[in-house]
């Protein structure tokens, strides 16, 4: 019996993309800019995904649940109170179609870092 995670990891979305057109693709990029190894850092992954263009909308899943609790190598990113704001600005400059936040409820914690991130995102969205 195959592990469903293996099947998910081995899914080749580009073959689907060439035969059927999905409405959107949402890579879950839940890493900070200083994540190590660098090939999995936020900046590296969004630049890689930005190369895939076509008729399919491209959004990015952002890991709000990691606010204040990222991996040791990226801890400063997740404790800045501005990481999601920076990530969203970068997505806009790369012409992504949007973003999705997981878990949205994480933004509404009473923790000062979560509050800061929520306020920064609200300002960005309000500036559109």
Predicted regions located by residue number:
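Substrate-binding cleft of secreted/luminal carbohydrate-active enzymes
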Residues: 13-38, 54-128
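Mature, folded catalytic cores of secreted/periplasmic enzymes
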Residues: 5-8, 15-16
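Charged helix-capping and loop-helix junction motifs
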Residues: 7-10, 40-46, 82-84
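Surface-exposed amphipathic alpha-helices with a cationic face
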Residues: 46-54
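Beta-propeller domains
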Residues: 1-3
């Amino acid at each position: 019996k195959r592990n469903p995670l293996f099947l998910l990891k081995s899914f080749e979305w580009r073959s689907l993309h060439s035969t059927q057109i999905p409405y959107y693709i949402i890579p879950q990029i839940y890493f900070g800019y200083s994540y190590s190894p660098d090939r999995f850092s936020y900046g590296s992954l969004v630049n890689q995904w930005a190369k895939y263009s076509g008729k399919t909308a491209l959004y990015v899943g952002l890991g709000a649940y990691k606010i204040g609790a990222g991996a040791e190598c990226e801890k400063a990113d997740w404790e800045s109170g501005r990481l999601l704001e920076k990530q969203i600005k970068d997505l806009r400059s790369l012409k992504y179609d949007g973003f999705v936040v997981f878990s949205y409820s994480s933004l509404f914690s009473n923790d000062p870092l979560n509050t800061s991130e929520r306020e920064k995102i609200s300002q960005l969205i309000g500036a559109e």
